Every structure is written in C-alpha cells, then in structure tokens.
C-alpha cells in the first residue's frame, strides 16, 4: 500500500510540474535553431514572464500561476520579425507545445524611434532623416566614449571632440554646440559652454542611439540647430541581466620615430558593469565605468626620467579607484556610476515615477596645440595644456501618468552639476535646472484616426561661475534662462500617408539680455509601395549664444580668446527630400539578404552664422599691444553673415543570413558643399580695427568653403557572427580640411611673434590628404555567458591630423572579456 501511495504522489508531482507549461523551439528561415531568442508571456494585469532559448533553440515557459487567465505570448529575435500568439484562457493541467519560425525581412530590420516626434514611430515612416546605431556598434568595437561610436555614422564627424552633422558646424574651442545631445530626451550640454562631456554618457546601458539630421529646434530647442543625438537607455524586462566587461590595451609607437620621446608604451584599462532587474513593481538598473587611459601623446617629463621597458602594469588587472593622477598629455582617468529606478504604482493605474542619476569623477590633461612638427607633434605647446579635475553629475526625478483614455502626462526634471577645476586659472562650474511638462494624446478620444498630438512646456535655468567668463562680470558669475512652449501634430491619412507639423516659441536670456523667436517644421512621408517610402521635410532652427561664447576671456600661450557681449542669435532653416527602399533577396547562392537603402538630398541656410574666428579683437581696454598679448590678435565668436550647406547622403543597412553565419552591415557616404554666402562681410566694424572677413581669415577660400569641414565622408562596418566565433571590420574616411583659420600659418610666419614655430605649413605639404582608417575585431563566445575578443583600432597605425596642430590616435590593440548572465 505505501508503494502505491508513493507512485500516486509521484504521478501527481509530475502532472502538476507540467501544468500550464509552454515548450518548443525557435527556428530561422533555414530551420536552424535560434539561440538567445526572447519568449515572453503577458497577462491582463500587465505581469510579464519570459525565457531565453537555449543554444539549440528550445525553450520552456512555466505559467502555472496564471491558470484560467488570458495570456499573450510573443517571440522576438534581433533583426527578425516578432510573432505573437494569444491563448484566451489557460487550461489547468494542460501542457502546450508551441514552436516559432522567425523570418528575416526588411521590415524586421526597421527600428522604432522616439526622437523624431517624441513618440514611438517606425524609422521608415518618419518625415526626417533618423539614423539608429545599435548597441553592438559600442559593445563589439571596444568603445570607451560615445564619440568613437558616432564616428561610424555617415554624416557625423568630429573636430577635437566637437560634433558636426552634415557640415553644420566647425571648430569653436568647445563652446556652442549646434548638435543637441540628449540622454533619454533630456539635454546634457553644459550650462555655460553648451558642450558635451563624451565620457560621461552611459555606454554600459544602451537601448540604441538615435541621430536626427537637420534643424530640430521645434522639438528640442536652441542647440538642435543642425541635429540631435539621443542616447536611449534600457530598462529591465522579465529577465534579469548582469554584464561585466574588462578591457586592456596599449597604443602602438608613432610612425614618426623622432616624435617619440618616451620609452614606455601608453596603456588603456577599462571596466564596465551593468545589472538590471525587475523586483515586483520596481525596475532597477545599476551601472558604471572605470577608465584609466594614458592617452597617446607625450608625457609631461622627458623620456630619461622613465626608462622602463614596456610591460603590462598591475593596474591593468586591478583598477585603483582612488588613483586618478595623469602624467601624459591626452590622458584621462575617470570613474562613473549610474542608476535608473522606476516604480509602476499599483494603487493608481497608469502612474509611473522614478529617479535616474549619473555621476562621474575624473582627471585629464589636454592640449589643443602640438609643440612642433615633425619632431614633437605629440608634445604640447607652452601654455596650451590644461589639467582638469572634473566632477559632473545629473539627478533626474520624473513622473508619468497614462489616463484610461490613453493620454500620457509626463513631468521630467534634471539637475546637472559640473565643476572643472583647472590648473591654469581657467576653472569653471555650473548648475543647470531643467524641467519639461509634456502631454501626448491620440485622436481616438475625438474620433480622429491616426492622430498623434504632442505639446509641452520647458523651463531651464543655468548658473555659472568661472575665471574664464570674466568678460560678463568681474567676479565671473553669469546666469542664463530659457522658456519655451511647443506643439507637434502627426497625422496618418490612410495606411500610406504620414504628415507632421510643429511649432515652438523660445525665449532666452543671458545676464538680462534676451531674445525670443518662433520656429516651425513641416514634413510628409508617403509609402509608394510595400517597402518604398518617400519623405520630405522643412524645419527652422534658432540658437542663442552660450555664456562662454559671449563672456570668455582667456589665453592659450600666445593664442588669446576674447569675449563678445554683442553676439547675436543665429537662425537657420533646413529642407530635404529623400527615399527609403527596403529590399529582400531570398534563397540566393550566398543566403538571404535583407535591408534598407536610403538616399537624401538636403540644404541648410544660416543667418548671423556664429563662427569662432581669428582677428584683431584686442588688446583689452587699458592694455598696450605687445608680444605678451599677441598685439591684440586672437580668436572670438562672431556673427559672420550668411552660409549654406547643400549635399547628398546615402546609406545601406542590411543583413545576410546563411545556415552557418549571419552578417550585419552598415555603410554610408555623405557629400556636403558648405559655403559662405557673404565672404566680404566685415564682422569687425571697429573703424580703428583691421577689417575681418571670411576672405581675410581663411587659409584657402577656393569655392568659398567654410572652415573645418570635410566635404566627403564615408563609413562602413560589418559584423559576422557564427555559432561560436565572430568578427568585424570597420572603415572610415573623410577628406582633409581644405580651409581653416589662416592664423595658424600666419602666427609662425609673423616676425613680430617670435618663439612660435609649429611647423604647420611643412606638415600640410607632406600630408595633404587624410588616410583611410580601418578597425578590426575577432572573438569567441561561449554558451555559458563568456566572450573574449581582440579589438584593433587604426589597424594600419596611420599617422594623421584632422585639425592642424592636433594629432589623432595611433593603433590601439585591446583584449576584451565580457561575462553576461541573463
């Protein structure tokens, strides 16, 4: 009898363990199992359970707790279609067998973007050019700052860390960005200079990076004059995720042997970590980064004081959190930690609130001007180096409420703190308090199908104290404020036509001097065929000068920088027409190929265009012209009249799938013709001063090309992934800067300015063009979450300079290990 009871008890356990269990396999077009596919189940209460398919594609999902409920199941895999199934009522005691077959289609590669209209849209159906960089661009290329990831996007270039979108800006000594940088729709530009801190952006927790090209001031305000870069972070889903990445590497010796004044190879050490998890109604994300980068420039001391042979130092294995001291030009040590907290309130349906925070402490030693070419192109010109101890942080409380009728109210805030403690009387600090109230609703409540309406109010206050900005007040204390109201309307007409329109009124004030202006945008998208989309757009932009542009007064050795309290806002409009074509080639000899081709023609015009330009701006009142103040010569932000950028951009994003491997590729080419439309305009009207025009300050005015622009830009990246091994190759190219400030040549050839011999002309004659830059990576992934890869940036160790007087990085060879639990 006891034996029968034991048998009955075992049968009951076996039956109950299989009750409401879903099991099956996930396969691709060729019938092969898909490892890492995500299968989720959702009940009417909004609870989510999930599982990830095993290496053979099989999965098991236990839903015993949901017996008798309606369940919606979905299966997704990156770059493939997402399938859904609904079970009206789970039957108690029943086991379900459910297989999934996912197809690669062009539509599946189409991504959802938020930046284009402040609500989720298909990237193919938006009315403006929006590019999306997936997390793999960051995770597989050994990226330590967002800047190096953005370099892979066609149309995006950098000059000394300053972003350009389609040649919309030049070089401005780090002040007054025309590209708005956002983290989760909130701006992160500094309150005084309007510049980003690239190392501060949280790469360890990326959902995707969205790039809008063209004037976007209607939705994002002043700094979005030529575009927007929005970093969207990821919140946890049903599966907890823990990921740790450890990266060590070294820089190769420069090709110019006489320029190498050191015996120890500079090293780079990087640690990134992330944990995200749902705990009941809480979403919790904790991440961080520790970077120790020696940089690739010369050390502060001569080589004879450091004669160790190259070896991996212990700091590459264990990271000293407290040691932030740097002793080489271009070096940077930083430690960052961030968290995202979100609560889905169970008492008030539709209410969500949370707090995001990100803080970073670091030290860097930077120089904008080399010592002399070619013997010391990795050294620093006297007085041009700055050691900075930086503390930067953001705290972002927010609340969001979704009404039963589908209207979303959100109130988002950001306090941003920045303190740059510099060693050359150029210290600066700022506080920014930003608040935005936004309402988004659809037309369903009014019986208008296809309508999305977004409106909002913005208030921003910035307080700055800096030795740098004494041009505004003797104590260096300055303030700025910004208030704005905007509205955006998106209307679908049937299944094929999408219309968009918006308006914004913005008022700025700096130290009591203000200006306001309305801006507008219009756009349309027409789906001609199943995967063919034609779009057109028109947008206006308005940018008010930053505190730094108006009030900075400093010097870098012989280079003086002067304030301009009379600097006026600049205005812009941009227009484009474009086509996006999806393609799919099934069962070819090499496999299935799907993707999108995009072609855009664009134009952008500027009025009162602000440029950081050289001229006779000094000396200061009461000073006598002398060698110490460069006889009043220097740089200043000035309104230079009108300018225009026209061009064409094309890109291809796609995927090749075979039974044994998968290849993802992104490539693009951008041509721009940025010109001055007022080359004779004198922006130094002082009758006692020398006339200052585009023509008089340009090194090469042929074609009226604007300074610090590269007309031709090409980008390519491919990632090949098999069951165990993966590899990738990147290529990037841009034409050399044909025009820049002639002062860099005139300074060293002016007999009155003795002691300056940068060797710029000789360098340009020997290096008239920029080289192709290649990056490579190869690695192996194990099924238990371990991944090891070798990453080489600047594979050929090309030696080059984009902006005269500033070298770019030589080859960097890194070993990267990642451990992930999900």
Task: Annotate each predicted stretch with a short phrase.
Residues 186-214, 273:
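Short acidic/polar hinge/loop motifs at secondary-structure boundaries
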Residues 95-100, 146-149, 164-166, 179-182, ...:
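N-terminal periplasmic accessory domains that precede
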Residues 410-413, 417-420, 461, 527, ...:
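Membrane-embedded beta-barrel scaffold of Gram-negative outer-membrane proteins
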Residues 185, 276-282, 287, 330-332, ...:
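Conserved C-terminal beta-signal and adjacent last beta-strands/turns
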Residues 245, 493, 498, 602-605, ...:
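Gram-negative outer-membrane beta-barrel transporters
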Residues 27-29, 37-44, 74-81, 91-139:
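Short, acidic, small-residue-rich periplasmic hinge/interaction motif at the N-terminus
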Residues 262-365, 391:
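Transmembrane beta-barrel wall of Gram-negative outer-membrane proteins
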Residues 147-186, 190:
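Extracytoplasmic beta-strand/coil segments of soluble accessory domains associated
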